[in-house]
């Protein structure tokens, strides 16, 4: 495993561990998801440049576009949750109530 690959794997695992262990606020969960997507984007871009393949050259841009859509959807859910419940605490959200 190269040094660069280890760095991006560690960044992804830190985002994943932050997502699993720190589930108090919706905003912190969204930030962990964005960190994971950023590490995936950089790793995919580095992989495409190392292999010098033109077949997968559009994959990082597609991942970046999906990440932007995910961020927009997450922020809209954050605003809707803050308006409906008054805060973004995940413990206050009960999915069984309408």
UniProtKB/Swiss-Prot annotation:
Cross-referenced Pfam families: Oxidored_q2
Bilayer topology term: Multi-pass membrane protein
One record GO biological process: ATP synthesis coupled electron transport
This enzyme's EC code(s): 7.1.1.2
Role: Core subunit of the mitochondrial membrane respiratory chain NADH dehydrogenase (Complex I) which catalyzes electron transfer from NADH through the respiratory chain, using ubiquinone as an electron acceptor. Part of the enzyme membrane arm which is embedded in the lipid bilayer and involved in proton translocation.
Compartment(s) of residence: Mitochondrion membrane
TM region positions: 1-21, 26-46, 59-79
Family listed: Belongs to the complex I subunit 4L family.
Catalytic activity: a ubiquinone + NADH + 5 H(+)(in) = a ubiquinol + NAD(+) + 4 H(+)(out)
Gene Ontology MF terms in the entry: NADH dehydrogenase (ubiquinone) activity
Domain of life: Eukaryota
Primary subcellular site in the record, as a coarse category: mitochondrion
Keywords on record: Electron transport, Membrane, Mitochondrion, NAD, Respiratory chain, Translocase, Transmembrane, Transmembrane helix, Transport, Ubiquinone
Protein name listed in UniProt: NADH-ubiquinone oxidoreductase chain 4L
GO CC annotation: mitochondrial membrane; respiratory chain complex I
